[in-house]
Every structure is written in structure tokens, then in C-alpha cells.
Swiss-Prot record:
CDD domains: DHQase_I (cd00502), NAD_bind_Shikimate_DH (cd01065)
Keyword Transcription regulation: yes
GO function term, MF aspect, one: 3-dehydroquinate dehydratase activity
Family: In the N-terminal section; belongs to the shikimate kinase family.
Domain topic, free-text comment: Is homologous throughout its length with the C-terminal 3 domains of the pentafunctional AROM protein. The function of the 2 C-terminal domains may be to act as a molecular sensor that detects the presence of quinate pathway intermediates as a prerequisite for the presumed conformational changes necessary for the control of transcription regulation.
UniProt record, GO biological process: chorismate biosynthetic process; quinate metabolic process; shikimate metabolic process
Keyword Transferase: no
Bias (Low complexity): 59-71
Key words of the record: Quinate metabolism, Repressor, Transcription, Transcription regulation
Region described as Disordered: spans on this chain: 25-79
Pfam families referenced in this protein's UniProt entry, alphabetically: DHquinase_I (PF01487), SDH_C (PF18317), Shikimate_DH (PF01488), Shikimate_dh_N (PF08501), SKI (PF01202)
Protein role: Multi-domain repressor protein that negatively regulates transcription of the quinate utilization pathway genes. May mediate its repressor activity by binding directly to the qutA activator protein.
Gene: qutR
Organism: Talaromyces stipitatus (strain ATCC 10500 / CBS 375.48 / QM 6759 / NRRL 1006)
Protein's recorded name: Quinate repressor protein
Amino acid sequence: MDTASIRGLSWSTLDPASYNSRKRSFEQMLLQQDSNESSRRTSPSRTHSRVDLERHSSHIVSLSSSNGSPSLEDPENRLYESPASARQYYGDESLILVGFPSAGKKTLGLIASAALRREFVDFDTVFVGKTGLSPREYIEAHGATAYRSVEDELTSEVFRSRQKGCVLVGFFAMASNRQRRLLKSLSTTNPIIHIQRDLGNMIHRGDSDKDRLYRTYQLSEKMHRRFANFEFFNIFQPMADDKPLGPLRLKATEREFVRFLNGIFPQSEASRGLKNLCSSSYTYALQAPSSWLDDPQADYTELDSGADAVEILVEMSPQNQQDLFFKLSQRVAVLRKYCRVPIILDLETSATMNYIAQVNLLELVIRQAPDVIMVSLDMSPHLVKQLSLAKGHSKIIGKYHQKGPISENWDLTNLQTVIDKASLLHCSAIRLTGEAYETNNNFGCVRVVLEARKLSDLPVSCYNTGEYGRSSICLNPILSPVVLPSQSTKQGITLADAQRGLFSSFWRTKKNFTVFGQNVSYSLTPAMHNAACIACGMPHTCDYVESDRLARIREVFERESQGGLAIVYPYKTEVVQMMDEMSLDAKVIGAVNTVVIERISTNEGSPKLYLKGYNTDHIGIRTCIEKNLSPANAIRSQTSALIIGAGGMARAAIYACIKAGVRNICIFNRTEANARRLADYFATVYTNLRLTILTDLSTPWPTDLWHPTIIVSCIPAHKVGDNDAPDFLIPEQWLGSSTGGVFVEFAYKPLVTRLIRFMQSRRSQGWIVADGLDVLVEQGIAQFEILTDRPAPSHIMRRTVREQYSIAQNAHSDHETTET
């Protein structure tokens, strides 16, 4: 598909006349179907088999409740038709998106098509190709009955040939009985995603009959929920009526949906998984209250606080069961939008819930495709079987809670029973909790964890709850519950509290990190890392050492509390020879910007320094590319990138493009020989690349390459030694992308370079600019996580860098004013 056609495709962007006409057709046919089925059910002149009655009645949602939503506990209410299939997909199954008009299916389908590199199949397009008329035009010309016949045949025909390698949208909008049977069959082999959206955001001006629209919506939601096997809530992206669509308006939606898809089709480069959460010592699960997530005034940046996972308690009560279908998907969507770490859904059932309600609640949780599902180890055998079949790629944590404390006198025979239950459920970890009556109760938790390691390889989390149980949370090794900073109470502790407890009791050792290089007094890295450490409750510090000699770095290595270094210009390549071990990234790039210092015991008594080298520059560049590349410019096989420069950062930039999936890379450098050496090097490492040298600014862009949608400037913007900063602009003949692209500037001294001003003037053409501070922060986030082995509070780091840069600029202006 032409990339230009991707931008802005959704019902909500159609002109009002087309939108309302199309939606009215949908409403009329669905309500007519409802009316027909209702009359068939109530007509005394017709008799039906029990199967017929069940099939027809199951299509109509009961609207007797206050909001028209079904009850989880109603034993007569079969919410889900899709079977308890394994939901284990391996990457080539076609993706089917269903839902109410204007929920954003087409937009999400195009995003999925680009991300998964699959054919995009839209029902309306197929229908026009078959009949020469749009669905609305066909209905007006031939009637609904004729349309239904063509629709049934066309749908069956498409799915006979496209069950693999496609993304299909617009089908099953008002599914007939024949289509429902097909949909039920497809749910055993293919992921079917029910797209949800707040109805208030789908009502357009001119929708005068709100009650009728609401009824139509309820019917649609009921039917699609029944036959789908996943649910995704599409968060509304507000837009002013008088402003055109910006190229990044759908970027957040793209990020959230691709992350959701990664839970269905796991990717090799997924975020920190359960293995990391349970193998690392002292990890934390941030508890996100449902009421807080539902509050539109909440500061959702708190979700990015440095925890290893975010957890939601999913429980049903008479007050919330009516809207839990909608609310749970919406809450999970908020988590995907505002945090980077795995999502845990903690399923809470009670003895008062009937079996139907428990099955429905479990299915609702599984449909969110969370990273982890937490369930009680006392779950009924039938639910255990349901979960084992239907969990897909979600991991399971088994939980066991006892009334009273887990103390030193706790019967360890209970531990073996708990472990056996967890093994039967195929759990990846266990959480044991008790209720502390006094602080002394907490020592037993440490004992239980140690004993569990002797009995099983399953990681065990063990702590007491309540005010007196807080110290056990500090000492618990994995997935300790921590509360939001704004929700701190005597009943819980924040992440910063937990970390301070570890360091103050000497379970963790304070470290120092150093920025090493020339002219580093202006570096923003120390302030960035120090702010992050403070936010996480860690007493680590970061300073800088400015030196004209690399040899001085040895003194820094030898400092007693030195935990690592950030290496900057000009020592990134020279320090390579000092490393005992390097990451693959650093080896390929040939440069190290992050050093971790380990101390290994020796027979001589004094520990030996062991230096590990990493490179996070490429991560900073790649993240800036991926965050700012619009869905219209999603990377595909024809995508081209332009790299300006041929030094160390250019190596990192090329590597970043390669890791992002770009295979066509052009290099421009004022010294052609250096550019050619760089191209020759990567040509030997990656044989599937096409590397082209642009010899000078008059060189035309290669005619057989797409114009670049990624441009990375890797040249200094200030004088370096005796060399003046390069001064040129990108030629117009290289800027031919009709959908713009992303321009990434490495330099931030000054922040607004001439190239940045030049590219900012092309914003109306779709160009997005990421400046040097953006790159600094993104590589700094990765650097922080390597140095501290902790997730970074990225919003703190971003804010600190911008604030410190502004302070430095103001101080510089004041100094110049004083001198004048």
C-alpha cells in the first residue's frame, strides 16, 4: 500500500456526510436483524428447536440493567463463544479486527499491517472491487437482503484464502448466522481482537438519536465480545477541529497497539519479561489502584517510577460488574500508554462468586493479553484447566494468602503443598503472603524464601502485609508490592522507601559513577543520573572527571566505591582495549560509552577489577527514530536512511538503523574517504545491507531508492580542536519524501543547530525533529539501567535534563551580560 494512504485513515476522519451515512446503514441493518430475530423468537406461528432458540437469543443483549451491560454472574448469560483455545500463535496467522464503527479498526489495522509486515485487507475495498459499489450504495440500489447474500459469499471467499499472512478489518460488522459460525471457527485458529472505544468519543455532530445509537452500540459490543478472543481499548487522541492531523497524532496509538500485539505474537526483543523479574534480586511491582487509573486528573507519569512491573487488582463486586468489561480494557490501555514495564493482572475471586462469574472474569483477564496473570493457588480444578488452555503467552504467578503472619514458627509442610499446587498450574513464580501482628513476625519470611530454594527452582516472593509487615517487603527478593508516591500510607511502602531500607541496612552498597572525557564540565549526565537515583531511593552519586589523558581513567577505576563510568569524547574507541568483556553492540560499533566495574575475589586476597563495556549511543538514536517516526513512515523493506558524518557516532547511527530494520543506508561526509571506510566496514559485517556514498551536496539521490524518511546528523555543531564545525544544509533533492520523516540531531551544544532550524521549517511537510537532548536522555536511560541494574524513572530524567539545560543557558546569558 502507498505510504501516503496510511495517514489519517479511520471513520472518525471521514467527512461528516459520509460518516453519518455509513453509520446509519450499519445501525439500520443491525437493528433490523435484532427486530427480525426478536419477532422470530416471539412469533407463535413458528417453532424452533432448542438449538435454534439458543442461537437466536444469544445474539441479543439484555438491556434491562441500568447501562445495558451484561452481568458477569448471570448463569443464563453466555458472554463468550470463543473456546478455551491455547491462544499460542506463532506469527503467520491472520489478524482479524472487529468492533463498532469508528472504534478505529482501520487505523489499527494499518498499524498492525506495517508492524507485522502483512497484507492489509479491508472489507469495503474488497466489496467495491467485487461489485463496483460501496456497501451503502449497494444497499440503496439492491436492498439489504441482496447485500447480505453478497456479503456472506464475499466474506467466506476471503477467509478461505487469507487465514495466514494478513490483517483483516471491516468484516463481521453485522454478522449473519452464517458469518457467526465462520467467526466462531476462526476463533480456534486466529487471533480476533475486539476493538473498544469510549462511545462518547464516537458520537459525531449530527447524531440526533443518541438512544438508538446506544442500543446499536450495545448489540455490536455484545456480539463482537462473544466471538473475539482478545480485547483492546483504543484511547481517544484529542484533536482541535481547526487543526490538520499531525504526523505523530497516532504515534501513541501505534506504540500501545504494537505492544499489545507483542503479547499475542511475542517478539525477540520484548521488554523485560517475567524471567528477568524473578531472576534479579530485589524487584518491585507497583500497585496501581483501579480508582486512581479511572481518575482523569491522575498524574500517570507516576507509573514510570522505576518499578520492575505494574500490577492491577481485578476483582468483581456488585457495584462494578456492570462496567468491568469496559473499564478493565481501559485501565490496561492506560498502563500501556504510560509505562514501559510488564503488566500484571492480579485476579481476585471469592467464594461468593458462582462458577459462571469466575469463568467470565478469568476470560476477561486473559483477553487483555497481559504479560503476567496472578491467580490463587486454591483455584478450582476446572478453572485451572481453563487457564492452562487459554492463557496464551501470558505467564502465571500463583498466590497463596493465609490469615495470620508467616512467622518463624510457620509450618514448612505448607510450603511443599503450595509448591506442588504451583507446579500443577505451570506457574513461573509464587507469591506467599500473611498478616503481621508485630514486627518480629517478619523474620519468618526470609526463612521461607531460603527453604523454598531448597525444595524447588520456582522463584518465591514472601512477605507479610499491613503496617507491621513493611520490613518484610523491604527484604523480600522479588516482586515486592510498592505503592504510588502519591498513595503512600502506613499500610504500604513506596519504591524509594524499599530501596532506602536495603541500603540503610547494608544489603546494598552505595556506588559512584563518573562521566570521563574532555570538556565534560558542561555535561548534563551527572545531574540526570543523580536525579534518577534520588527518585528511586538509591544513595548512588554521579560526578565527572575532565582529562586530556586517557591514562587517568585508571585512577577512577581504582576508586573503592566506583561502580562504573560514562565515557564521552574522545575516548570511546580508545577505552575498548581496556575492557575484559564487551557487549555485542559495543563490539560491532567499535566503541564503548558505558563501563561497569565488577570486583572478583582472587587467591591473593585483594579483588581483581573486571571491566565490562557497553554502548548505549545506538539505543538513544534508535529510540528517537522509533518514537518520532510516524505510522505513515513505518519501517519496511524499501525504507532508506541518511547518515551525516563518518565518525564514532555515525557508527552508532548506522547500527541503530540496522537494528530498527533499515537495509538501505546512504552516508554523506565532507571527507569521502572516511565515509567509504565506514561503508566498507559495515558491508563486511552485514551482507544484506545496501550502503551508498553521497560524494558531495550536488549528488542526486539514487533513483532506485526511496527518499530517506530517517536522517541522523552525527557531526559536531561547535568547533572541536582546530576543526571548525561543518556548516551546510541538506540539499532539497535529498528531501523528497512525500510523508516527511524524522531528523535526529546528535549535538546539543548549541541545542538548536542550523540543521535543526532548517528541518523545523519543514514540519508542515511531515518532518519531526529530535534534538540532542532527546538523544542524550534516551541513551542515558539505557545507561542508567546498565549501571544500576534497575529500571529508570525516565520521566524524571527527561525533566531534569531540560531543566538543567535551561539553568545552564540562563547562567551563560547572565555571565555574558555581566561581562558586557
